[in-house]
């Protein structure tokens, strides 16, 4: 079986009830969220306590001093999370059916991403033009 989701992808769109689950979760901005997430990973034992948070990419704007339209950015993060949430639900339904049919234990599940980072996020950076790479 092959399942291909178009989410998460621009344009960002999700069900209102899914977006509502994430209302307020991103209000503090990405810099604080990064710090909280690494601390939570330490507490859970997922990473070593001595591992440090990498510096924010120098091309990514500082949330506190450089983001002009925070409400827009917050909404983008809420909708993006809602898209992932709906995808997760769908994958869960597939897993449930595999278990019901008794074939889960004989199934390999691969999660693949074809796009890498979102190219539309250039507005979140100091970059104004696409960067062209050559080998």
Task: Mark where each language-model region is.
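Active-site His/acidic residue clusters
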Residues: 1-36, 46, 54-79, 115-124
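Metal-dependent active-site segment of extracytoplasmic phospho-/sulfohydrolases and closely related
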Residues: 47, 51-57, 86-123
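Catalytic-adjacent loop/helix segments of enzymes that bind and process anionic phosphate/sulfate esters
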Residues: 78-82, 86
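Conserved small/polar residues in nucleotide/adenosyl-binding loops
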Residues: 125-131
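Conserved acidic, metal-coordinating active-site core of Asp-based
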Residues: 41
